[in-house]
Amino acid sequence: MTDNALRETIIRLAQPVVHTLGLVIWGVETARAGRTIVRLFVDVPTIPQRPGMPEGSEEPSSAITAPAPAHDPQESSGAEAPAAPTSATIEQCEEISRHLALALEVEDSIADAYVLEVSTPGLSRLFFSLEQMIPYVGDVVEARLHTPVASTDPAAHGGPRRVWRGTLVAVEDDAFVLAPVTVSPEGEVEDENQPPVRLPWEAVRRATRMYIFKKPQKPGKKPGKPQGKEVPKGGSGSTAPKKAAAKKKAGRTAAEND
């Protein structure tokens, strides 16, 4: 079974239980390293909103929504409704994993040994379509390409790159645009002062949102803190014995000269 066929099978088998739990399938990733690894990512339903779309506009017909919840009599009584979940829970991922593993066993979809992983996309999420990138305009994205791509702007310096990192500034029908940046190991983001680069989606091998974690600064000495021991006021300090010894030595020298 090809990777594309395997991903389609995983989506078909997982969709019923995922939908029942009020979640959506974010994407499926497969890898073959000795044995097949299948990663299913599930998330809470969101409505992508293109930049410039006014708030409160009608939901597009292609958007995926969760099943309508049953009417709660407490809503009419003025009770405060619980906050909407922001991510799938561990228990939900475990339940999806059990159902999906059983379905794969019944259909014998994967002949060889395999590893099944069900999780949320996380903060550094992998994008499986351009539509998924729309809510993350303004975030830093890393794009790994099949072949090196150079900026088409004549003002750009540097050659083609296989890996681009930049702030996501626009999402088009068949491409997305990054403003190149550099990210230091300490989590500092600096603009490369280059024109934005347009990356066709078909040229992208892997695109992920970069979660920038700034390392905390190490605690240092307070500014203006004196070095060594503080000399007490009034001239009585560690230097006083040295002065007294110097005077005594000078007295002995004068007596010897006499």
Swiss-Prot record:
InterPro entries: Ribosome_maturation_RimP, RimP_N, RimP_N_sf
Gene Ontology annotations of biological process type: ribosomal small subunit assembly; translation
Pfam families for this protein: RimP_N
Keywords: Cytoplasm, Ribosome biogenesis
Region feature (Disordered): 48-88, 212-258
Entries under SUPFAM superfamilies matching the protein: YhbC-like, N-terminal domain
Record-level GO cellular component terms: cytosol
Principal location class: cytoplasm
Organism superkingdom: Bacteria
Subcellular location: Cytoplasm
Comp. bias intervals (Basic residues): 215-224
Family, similarity comment: Belongs to the RimP family.
Protein role: Required for maturation of 30S ribosomal subunits.
Full protein name: Ribosome maturation factor RimP
Annotated source species: Desulfovibrio desulfuricans (strain ATCC 27774 / DSM 6949 / MB)
